Amino acid sequence: MKKAILGKKLGMTQIFNENGRVIPVTVIEAGPCVVVQKKTEEKDGYKSIQIGFGDIREKLVNKPLKGHFAKSGVSLKRFLKEFKVDNIDEYEVGQEIKADIFAEGDRIDVSGISKGKGFQGVIRRWNAQRGPMSHGSKFHRAVGSMGASSDPSRTFKNKKMPGHMGNKNTTVLNLQVAKVIPEKNIILIKGGVPGPNKSFVSIKDTVKA
């Protein structure tokens, strides 16, 4: 992996391409991020950089993290994430990473925490089939069979059941950068990305390239 940045999802809009077609895009405030830590093969066993994004009040940061930032000489950041990189020599602690590291047409993977939907049944959560709705049926939106009888006398793990839907780490692969506005730290990405507005996302080169 060569490039990565952190950002905040601002919402969705639409733009027009050169043929006049409407393209739905997600607006991301990408950076400026700062390199908080470098990890090397000799010291840590692998090569990576830790970058931070978004200012935060001092009272909201615990003592270990304050020491971590003080050691790097970097101001406190709200969102920290580590990325494995091949070209670690190109980065230094305190270096800024801005939106212009990406260009129009780049293929990227975007990770974030999906929107929480609360407690949902199997029809919405797992797209299960509904039961008969006619008179006489008592089975409409229920779970249905959860396993066999006396053997094995239990419900297997990972059975698709009602439960908390969403609010999980989600990655959308192979999206395309529609436009970069470096002076405003804005990246427009074709299509949707995980999470509600104002949520944090990470953007990196796609693994599918």
Curated annotation (Swiss-Prot):
Superkingdom assignment: Bacteria
Q: Which InterPro entries does this UniProt record tie to the protein?
A: Ribosomal_uL3 (IPR000597), Ribosomal_uL3_bac/org-type (IPR019927), Ribosomal_uL3_CS (IPR019926), Transl_B-barrel_sf (IPR009000)
GO MF, one term, reads: structural constituent of ribosome
Q: Which N-terminal stretch is annotated as signal sequence?
A: none
Q: Does the keyword Ribonucleoprotein apply?
A: yes
The alphabetized list of GO BP terms reads: translation
Q: Name one GO cellular component term.
A: cytosolic large ribosomal subunit
* Record carries keyword Ribosomal protein: yes
Give the Gene3D superfamilies listed for this entry.
Answer: 3.30.160.810, Translation factors
Q: Where is this region: Disordered?
A: 130-154
Cited Pfam families: Ribosomal_L3
Q: What does this protein do?
A: One of the primary rRNA binding proteins, it binds directly near the 3'-end of the 23S rRNA, where it nucleates assembly of the 50S subunit.
Membership in a protein family:
Belongs to the universal ribosomal protein uL3 family.
Q: Summarize the subunit comment.
A: Part of the 50S ribosomal subunit. Forms a cluster with proteins L14 and L19.
Q: What is this protein called?
A: Large ribosomal subunit protein uL3
Q: What is the lineage of its organism?
A: Bacteria, Bacillati, Bacillota, Clostridia, Eubacteriales
